[in-house]
Every structure is written in structure tokens, then in C-alpha cells.
Amino acid sequence: ELADLKRICDNRALVLIEDNCESFGASHQNKYCATWGTAGTFSFFFSHHLQTMEGGMIVTDDQDLYDYMRSLRAHGWVRDIGDNSSLYTKSGDPFEDSFRFVLPGYCVRPLEMSGAVGQVQLSKANDMLDQRIVNSKIYHHFFDNVDYARTQLPTQNSVHSYFGFSFVLENNLYNRRKEVIHLLKEYDIECRPIVAGNFMRNPVIDR
């Protein structure tokens, strides 16, 4: 589907931005998820594949977008962008440019502590991703023998990174989700919706 989405966006001059917060390490057709579009987002919250306690990252190969995001990340100033950026052409005097603000920016730079934790996590990332795949095979082996749940399988030429293990209730468990959630909680098994659903139905859209 990523290839189809990319083709649709290219044909209609649309910008493809991938929410990849739960798919770190996943790939399709030997191309990492989050690299198919103009930009891709990742979350490094503590429950995700790679943890830095909080925060995340955005990846892009668009230099203009990169400069805009670097500026927005740090107060809207220009000290972190290139000398000849389309966003702003620097004067060449670092003293003058150090506090030149061109965007209504934020202060969302990662802390050094988060960076240190992230570097340690990154060194173990491949092993952790491999273990998630091993775990998924155990779960798939069990669910292959039941008729009350349909599991999510990788599509052809894809690698699944298993943020969690998702399934859809069917047959005698159809429409009994609350009962299943209650039972899982009794055994201290954490569960959540597969995704957030239609975001356009959230109250924030009305504001």
C-alpha cells in the first residue's frame, strides 16, 4: 500500500507524510517505512521500540523542510540552518545571526540525557527488533489454531517490527471486546486499540 500511496501522491502533487511512530525498523520492498514520503515521524516515548524517555524525530530528504524544522525546533532562530537556506540567507556574521528569529518557533530540542539513553537503545535496536519477531511467531503459532481472532500478518516483501501484537475478534468473540479487555487486565496483560481510529472524529477537530 505504501507504493500505491506514493504513486497517488506523485500523480496528484500531494505531500506524503508518514506517521511511523509505531513502526520503527519496519520496511516494505526493501525500503524503510517513514522514507517513502516527504517526511516521516517517529516516537521515542518509553513504550516504543526505541526509547529516550520522551520526544521523537522527523526524517526527510527535503533540504528546505529540514531547515524549517531545525528552526522551528529551536525558537525559530537561524543559527542551526545552512548559510544559504531558502528560509533565510545569513549575513555571514555569526554575532548578528546568533539571535536572528524568522519563525514563531518552539523549544523542543532533545535533552542530553535523552540523547544518551537513545544512543544506548540504538546500539541494541537490531537485537530488540529481532526478538519482537521471535515473540510474534510464538503468538502467531497459538492464534493459528483458533477461530475467534484474526491476526495481522506482514504483507509480501515487508518486514513487520511488531510494536505490539494486534488481532481482531471474530466468531464467538465478535462484539465482546469489553469482556476480553477485562480478562486481559485481570492477568496484568496490557492492551489498547490497534490505532486511534478516525482522527477527524476527535474533539480537537471542532476547535
Feature names for model-found ranges:
Residues D19-S23, G55, M113:
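Generic detector of well-ordered alpha-helical packing
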Residues L2-D4, N11, S27, Q63-R207:
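PLP-dependent aminotransferase class I/II
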Residues E1-L5, R12-W36, G40-S43, H49:
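Conserved PLP phosphate-binding loop immediately N-terminal to the Schiff-base lysine helix
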Residues T35-D80, E112:
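Active-site PLP attachment segment
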